[in-house]
Amino acid sequence: MSHVRRFDHVGITVSDLNTVTAFFVGLGLEVEGTRTFVEGEFLDTVIGIPDSRTEIVMLRPPDGGTRLELSSFVRPDHQPGSPAAMANELGLRNVAFEVDDLQAAVDRLAADGYGLVGDIGQYEHIWRMAYVRGPEGIIVSLAERIG
């Protein structure tokens, strides 16, 4: 018997909620609901940080699949990670999206100042894929099904 019912969301803690939200909205995600501040006993208990307060934006893909939660801590101040972490460093390293036109997505992000981590690669005759370094060092994997 499985205890997991579905994959609900992936959470990313960020410093600049506006910039990161705009990046993902530019990729085609949609803001779900309104920005929300969360604080109090519930948050302190779940995350194990007393007197914490965070602002959250939930984003969803147009098809309504797994959501992306962006969280920016008001208190305590966020702890910076490595903004240049590479794909082989331990921990969550990328968030992946299937796109209709990989080159167009890469070109649009490049126009906004976001570059490739490596280059565009092809896996057999099935996928074209690239890693883009987004705001705050977030690695975003973009994949286009070609076969």
For each predicted feature, which ranges?
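Vicinal oxygen chelate
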Residues: F7-S15, E55-V74, G81-R108, R128-R133, ...
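A cross-kingdom feature marking solvent-exposed beta-strand/loop segments within repeated
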Residues: G40-T45, H78-S82, D119, Y123
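N-terminal beta-strand motif that seeds the catalytic metal site of vicinal oxygen chelate
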Residues: M1-T21, L27-R35, G91-F97, I146-G147
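Core segments of cupin and vicinal oxygen chelate
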Residues: T13-G65, A104, A111, A130
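Acetyl-CoA-dependent GNAT
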Residues: S72-P76, E144-G147
